[in-house]
Amino acid sequence: MHQGYRKDPINHKGIDLYFRGSTIVKSHFKYLLEKHNFAHADRVVMTGISAGAIGAFMWSNYAQTIIHDPTALLVISDSGVFLPFNIFGAPFDAAKTSLQALFSVVNVEEKTPLDLCNKAFPGAEWNCLSLLNSYCSISAPILLINSQYDSYVINNFSINSFKG
């Protein structure tokens, strides 16, 4: 999911952290095109679990633009749907707060790869990290497996995560 781009690093405890995820993802696609004839694949399945599923959603439209038969692409995700409510008694919408914070750090120079969704949420493009908001802008078929159980959410957004 951490596919954004931030030109300048963030210094954390004396170490520069670079956020160039979109460049890295595009370089992976370039490698597949050059070394594995990806453009002529007769079946492409993008998949991921939790944040990886969000990455698959985010990049599926881009992948369709670089293959000769866009209908050959399918997204199969295990989880990756963070429901918008105060999860397990948390004092606030933990998923929303986390996605907003992540987006404000890593998506400085670029928004998501989902242009249609970005246009639907001007100034609040972080909403596109949620399948609930980006679904209509994804052109590939999606098969959701275990969509309402996300192990990251269970472990990190529970009420115990917010105790003093």
Spell out what each predicted region is:
Residues 1-164:
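C-terminal His-loop and adjacent cap/lid subdomain of alpha/beta-hydrolase
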